[in-house]
C-alpha cells in the first residue's frame, strides 16, 4: 500500500461504499475502527481480492475490529435524493452505528458527508488506508450477499453474476421483463425499460 500519514488521533474510522453504479438494490456502506493490537494481514481494496479471500477477511474484521457498522440507502432513497446524496446518507448511518465514537473519520473518495467529528476524504483510500480497506470489504461482502439473495427471487435477471451493474445481459433482461421493485427508477436504463424516459 502507498504510505498514508494518519491524523494524530487514536480512534480512526475508515468508511467506504459499494453499489453506486448498479441499477438495482441499495448502496451499502461500512465504517470500521481497527484495533492496533490485533492487526489483520492482507487488507486491500475489496475489488482486488478474490471472493474467497474477501469472505475470510470479512469474518476476521468483524472479530478483531474495535467497532464496525453497516449503513445503507435503499433504492427509493436513491431515487428521491440522487445517488451522491444517498451515498452520503448511507455513510452517515454507518458512522452513527459505531458503538465507539471515532475521533476522526477517513472516507474513500473525494467527498465527505457531514459528520459530528473531523473527517477527510482520501482518494484511492481503499488501497492506501487499512481502515478504509476493511470497510470496503465489509460493504462488498454484504452487498454481494444481498444480490445473491435477490437472484433467488428473480433468477431471470442474473443478479448474482453482475451484482446489478448495467451489463449487456442485465440490460437485455430489463428490456425483456421490465423492472423489479428493487430497481432504481431514477437511473436511465430503468427509466427507459419502464417507458419513463423522455
Curated annotation (Swiss-Prot):
Any GO CC annotation of this UniProt entry: ribonuclease H2 complex
GO BP annotations, alphabetical order: DNA replication, removal of RNA primer; mismatch repair
Domain (RNase H type-2): residue spans on this chain: 10-198
Main localization category: cytoplasm
UniProt xrefs under InterPro entries: RNase_HII, RNase_HII/HIII, RNase_HII/HIII_dom, RNaseH-like_sf, RNaseH_sf
Gene3D superfamilies reported for this sequence: Ribonuclease H-like superfamily/Ribonuclease H
Pfam families, sorted: RNase_HII
Top EC class, one word: hydrolase
Free-text comment on the cofactor: Manganese or magnesium. Binds 1 divalent metal ion per monomer in the absence of substrate. May bind a second metal ion after substrate binding.
Reaction catalysed by this enzyme: Endonucleolytic cleavage to 5'-phosphomonoester
Record: residues binding a divalent metal cation: 16-17, 108
Residue stretches in coiled coil: none
Matches recorded under CDD domains: RNase_HII_bacteria_HII_like
Keywords of the record: Cytoplasm, Endonuclease, Hydrolase, Manganese, Metal-binding, Nuclease
Molecular functions (GO terms): manganese ion binding; RNA binding; RNA-DNA hybrid ribonuclease activity
Cofactor needs: Mn(2+); Mg(2+)
Cellular compartments annotated: Cytoplasm
The EC number(s) this enzyme carries: 3.1.26.4
Cited function: Endonuclease that specifically degrades the RNA of RNA-DNA hybrids.
Family, per entry: Belongs to the RNase HII family.
NCBIfam families, per database record: PRK00015.1-1, PRK00015.1-3, PRK00015.1-4
Protein name in the entry: Ribonuclease HII
Protein's gene: rnhB
Amino acid at each position: 500500500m502507498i504510505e498514508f500519514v494518519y491524523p494524530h488521533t487514536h480512534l480512526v474510522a475508515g468508511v467506504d461504499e459499494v453499489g453506486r453504479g448498479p441499477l438495482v438494490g441499495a448502496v451499502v456502506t461500512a465504517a470500521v475502527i481497527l484495533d492496533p493490537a490485533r492487526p489483520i494481514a492482507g487488507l486491500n481494496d475489496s475489488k482486488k481480492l478474490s471472493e474467497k479471500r474477501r469472505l475470510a477477511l470479512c469474518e476476521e474484521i468483524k472479530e478483531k475490529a474495535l467497532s464496525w457498522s453497516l449503513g445503507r440507502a435503499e433504492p427509493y432513497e436513491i431515487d428521491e435524493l440522487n445517488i451522491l446524496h444517498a451515498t452520503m446518507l448511507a455513510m452517515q448511518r454507518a458512522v452513527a452505528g459505531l458503538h465507539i465514537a471515532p475521533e476522526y473519520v477517513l472516507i474513500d473518495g473525494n467527498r465527505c458527508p457531514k459528520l459530528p467529528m473531523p473527517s477527510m476524504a482520501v482518494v484511492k483510500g481503499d488501497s492506501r488506508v487499512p481502515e478504509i480497506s476493511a470497510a470496503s470489504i465489509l460493504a462488498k461482502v454484504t452487498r454481494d450477499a444481498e444480490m445473491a439473495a435477490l437472484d433467488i427471487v428473480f433468477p431471470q435477471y442474473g443478479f448474482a453474476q453482475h451484482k446489478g451493474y448495467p451489463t449487456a445481459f442485465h440490460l437485455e433482461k430489463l428490456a425483456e421483463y421490465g423492472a423489479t421493485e428493487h430497481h432504481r427508477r431514477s437511473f436511465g436504463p430503468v427509466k427507459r425499460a419502464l417507458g419513463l424516459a423522455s
